[in-house]
Swiss-Prot record:
Keywords: Cell inner membrane, Cell membrane, Cobalamin biosynthesis, Magnesium, Membrane, Transferase, Transmembrane, Transmembrane helix. Joins adenosylcobinamide-GDP and alpha-ribazole to generate adenosylcobalamin (Ado-cobalamin). Also synthesizes adenosylcobalamin 5'-phosphate from adenosylcobinamide-GDP and alpha-ribazole 5'-phosphate. InterPro entries: CobS. It is an enzyme of class 2 (transferase). Pathway: Cofactor biosynthesis; adenosylcobalamin biosynthesis; adenosylcobalamin from cob(II)yrinate a,c-diamide: step 7/7. One of its GO terms (molecular function) is cobalamin 5'-phosphate synthase activity. One of its GO terms (biological process) is cobalamin biosynthetic process. Belongs to the CobS family. The gene is cobS. GO terms for cellular component: plasma membrane. Its main location: membrane. The chain crosses the membrane at residues 29-49, 50-70, 104-124, 129-149, 166-186, 194-214. It is found in: Cell inner membrane. This is Adenosylcobinamide-GDP ribazoletransferase. The lineage of its organism: Bacteria, Pseudomonadati, Chlorobiota, Chlorobiia, Chlorobiales. It comes from Chlorobium chlorochromatii (strain CaD3).
């Protein structure tokens, strides 16, 4: 069982983790929410330390860049590849071929720049109100969405790829367990503000569903790049939602 945790940590972070990987990589999906909580706590702590100076813009930049560093830029790279492939390839084969190209095209650069800017703007707002729990929640819910996408959709490539071993054995038990685990991890932070947790969860599920639907229509399933893009888009959706909940002009 702990092999799944080792695999999840090695896959999702740069942390040097001793131990043996899971024999079946899909077993690591059960641990994705826990790794999301760990990453979220580290980034929230980084944001807190940065905010002590009162310079929330710089603290937010630390959070955004810290997320890239701690994940080896893997999810950000996936977002860029998906943007290039989905909007640059007219057929499934063309999209998959473009996504495999290591260079970043114009669509990828625009998507990456836009998402990172939105993240930064949202995190500035969250940190200025001391909402470190929402920063953490975005990271945690993004890993839940990765499990849901891997469990709900088939692997899109004919040949094996980075995520094929995770997607191959994934199914409803992984999705259901990850959802329950995520709720259990989030609930202690929102016992006095349960509606906020529901809004954040809803934002994550909407973002994940949209990624899944677009990916299924475009390439017939998911790849590692799609899982990475789903993570990035979920983070920004949750953080933007959290920032909007602070607005005096919106009645939630």
């Amino acid at each position: 069982m702990l092999g799944g945790l080792v695999t999840a940590l090695r896959t999702l972070t740069i942390l040097p983790i001793p131990g043996k990987d899971a024999v079946t990589f899909s077993h690591s999906l059960y641990w994705f929410p826990f790794v999301g909580l760990l990453l979220g706590a580290l980034l929230a702590a980084l944001g807190y330390v940065g905010s002590l100076s009162g310079w929330h813009e710089f603290a937010a930049l630390l959070v955004v860049l810290g997320g890239i560093v701690l994940t080896r830029g893997m999810h950000a790279d996936g977002l860029a590849d998906v943007a290039d492939g989905f909007w640059g390839g007219r057929s499934k084969e063309a999209a998959l071929r473009i996504m495999k190209d290591p260079t970043v095209g114009s669509f990828g650069a625009l998507a990456l720049s836009g998402v990172m800017l939105l993240k930064w703007v949202a995190v500035v707002r969250l940190l200025s109100f001391g909402l470190f729990d929402v920063v953490m929640a975005g990271i945690l819910l993004a890993r839940l969405v990765q499990v849901l996408l891997a469990s709900a959709l088939p692997y899109a490539r004919r040949e094996a790829g980075t995520a094929s071993a995770f997607v191959a054995g994934a199914g409803a038990p992984h999705a259901f367990s990850a959802l329950l685990f995520t709720l259990a991890l989030l609930f202690p932070f929102y016992t006095e503000n349960f509606p906020t947790m529901l809004w954040l969860l809803g934002a994550a599920l909407v973002a994940g569903s949209m990624v899944g639907m677009v990916s299924y229509r475009k390439i017939g399933g998911v790849t590692g790049d799609v899982l990475g893009a789903g993570s990035e888009l979920t983070e920004v959706a949750v953080w933007i939602t959290g920032a909007l909940l602070l607005s005096d002009y919106l009645l939630f």
